[in-house]
Regions:
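N-terminal pre-catalytic "stem/leader" segment of glycosyltransferase-like enzymes
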Residues: 1-122, 141, 276, 317-318, ...
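Alpha-helix C-terminal capping/helix-to-coil transition sites in glycosyltransferase folds
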Residues: 87, 138, 239-240
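Catalytic core of nucleotide-activated saccharide and alditol-phosphate transferases
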Residues: 98, 103-200
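Active-site regions of enzymes building and remodeling cell-envelope glycoconjugates
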Residues: 28-38, 48-57, 139-143, 151-164, ...
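Donor nucleotide-activated moiety binding/catalytic core segment of transferases
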Residues: 208-322
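Short, polar loop motifs at secondary-structure junctions
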Residues: 18-20, 126, 143-151, 210-216, ...
Length: 329
């Protein structure tokens, strides 16, 4: 498809290089006047990729800026594109791909007269605050899915987005009643363990992957502790479950990957995320939003029924490109 834009002749997307990043952004690959770069550097050499990853380590560089990062310039995928100075170009980074790019190179791109720089935060600002703060001035538009971050840092709000990468699974191929994967700390841990056992007691099947659990609390048989899943593995399990479970920590807000997966792939959703009430899909009856564990209806989780949200590309990143074009000057 050709994106009809008032301000840009070409879009360049610098993706974060992860499989979940592909799931979020891959619709852009279908846009004729867009270039999709899978990662910051253009190299299949795993040693080089590892060295780049270490040199731009979020943990290390948040404490002390490692020197000589500008040496990566000639490896940047975007540098090899040779941006046409006669075209109006929009370059989009995520917070992750921006933080894996040298600040001086971002400054160089920002100074090009025909380029508009956009950053899209797919994580809360707190997670990489120091690194992002160094780069903010080199972006013309900055978006976040988190309303609190938008209010605190003066960012533009845009809900998270998602691209369909799988075909839906037939109802008779559903293997579990509930699926959860994520960090399980504090209040979340007690909610999740109780929910797991409540489902199992009804004869249902729950598949929970919990991380961040203290050794003394890893005693619930049937729960998977600290078992890493690739995003492909996560999607495999989402496709085969009846209900996706999402338990948010205190202070978190905004639409999440789990919620979008449930809606896009027609799964029931159990969540304590109040943000889902703002969605038109909330009235479908396939989403249960609870305040306390006592509010959870186990029958909602285990009862099998055909789920259809009538989803029609509502979360596609194509709409973000349209928004960016609207906000451009």
């Amino acid at each position: 498809m050709q994106l009809d834009s008032k301000h840009f002749e070409e879009y360049i997307m610098v993706a974060p290089g992860s499989d979940y990043g592909v799931a979020m952004w891959s619709d852009i690959k279908n846009v004729e006047n867009a270039v999709f770069l899978d990662y910051v550097i253009d190299s299949k050499n795993r040693v080089l990729q590892l060295l780049h990853h270490i040199h731009f380590s979020f943990g290390i560089n948040s404490r002390v800026q490692l020197p000589l990062q500008q040496l990566w310039k000639h490896q940047y995928a975007i540098n090899k594109l040779r941006i046409d100075s006669k075209k109006r170009v929009c370059i989009i980074f995520t917070d992750i791909s921006a933080c894996r790019t040298d600040v001086s190179y971002l400054k160089h791109l920002h100074e090009l007269d025909n380029v508009t720089m956009v950053m899209v935060l797919v994580n809360v600002m707190e997670s990489k605050h120091k690194l992002i703060k160094k780069r903010l001035s080199y972006f013309d538009q900055v978006y976040s899915f988190d309303r609190r971050d938008c209010e605190k840092y003066g960012l533009s709000y845009y809900p998270t987005f998602y691209s369909i990468t799988r075909k839906t699974v037939e109802k008779d191929k559903i293997a579990t009643d509930a699926f959860f994967v994520g960090v399980s700390k504090g209040d979340r841990h007690s909610i999740l363990t109780k929910l797991f056992h409540d489902i199992e007691r009804t004869g249902g099947k729950a598949e929970f992957y919990l991380s961040g659990v203290g050794q003394s609390e890893k005693h619930d048989e049937g729960i998977h502790y600290d078992q890493w899943l690739s995003y492909k593995d996560v999607l495999d399990r989402v496709m085969e479950t009846n209900c996706v479970v999402e338990i948010m920590g205190k202070g978190q807000s905004g639409l999440t990957l789990r919620a979008m997966e449930a809606i896009v792939y027609n799964k029931k959703l159990l969540t304590n995320n109040e943000s889902v009430k703002e969605l038109p899909f909330y009235e479908s009856g396939y989403i249960q939003c609870f305040e306390t564990p006592d509010d959870i209806d186990i029958d909602f989780i285990v009862n099998r029924e055909a789920v259809d949200y009538g989803y029609n590309g509502d979360f596609s990143p194509i709409h973000l490109l349209e928004k960016i074009d609207e906000q451009a000057t």
